[in-house]
Amino acid sequence: MASADGRRPVVVGVDPDPSKRLALAWAADEADRRGLPLRLVHAQGMPTGGYRSGEARPSWEEWNRVLHGAGDRILEEAVAFAESRRPTVEVSTSLAEGEPAWVLREEAGNASLVVVGSGHLSTRREMFASASVALPLTAHAPCPVVVVPEPEHVTEQPAYFVVGVDGSPHSAAAVDLAFEEAALRGAALRALYAWRPSLLGVLDEDAALSECRRVLSETVAGRTSTHPEVELHHEVVRGHPVQVLTAASEHALGLVVGTRGRGGFTGMLLGSVSQGVLHHAHCPVVTVPV
């Protein structure tokens, strides 16, 4: 929920494993940079499997007691971590019974952005750090979603962000946020248009390449006046978008891509490029809905 003064928080899904704090650290740092409150969310759905033959399932009341006992401890530890890292950030918590992806989707309605991890943990846990959370959340959330990889991503200097451009309204929204993120960190920005020549060889490749450059230039035009402090590099790169963006992410602070989002089935709406970079990027990935 928004704070009393109307500021929408940075929401982060809290992993039950205290050794996995990269998403929480990223969210706390982002809240501090933006002057926003931080909301820590932990959720678990009641287990539906994993019981031995003849073993009775717990009642909802029993499961609720377990959830609150463990969940309160998980959130207390997460709050201590966040407050020690960014003491001036206002922190709130939420403990919920339900599937993490859908709990976070509800939280996203009043958030500036939502942050989750992407490590692959045991499937016997309900967790925020799995593709089963990241993919449906990025497909349905009405706000930007940040997926932070485990283990920690190490960047090289000079620092830069990467944004994928394809001329669509989705990539235009991604460019806007990418400029913001770069400006907040004093980083440069690389805007990339991935170009694949026609497999049939029937197109004028020089004309097609010129068109790609035109679209890229028009997409980034005007943003430099809003963020003149951001050093911008833009280029058209030959290759599949997922491969181009994944390669560019290797030493980046973050990768920003647009997504259709907020609709039906995950695989149909998230898009192959967004899904591909979520699986393969080396750095935090920010998906931006329109």
Predicted regions and their residues:
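Small/aliphatic-rich secondary-structure junction motif
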Residues: 2-60, 159-205, 224-227, 231, ...
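A short acidic, glycine-rich active-site loop
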Residues: 59-73, 207-211
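General small-molecule cofactor/ligand-binding pocket signal
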Residues: 39-41, 92-96, 146, 190-192, ...
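Short beta-strand elements of ligand-binding domains
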Residues: 115-118, 145-151, 287-289
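Structured core of small recognition/catalytic domains
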Residues: 188-257, 265-278, 284
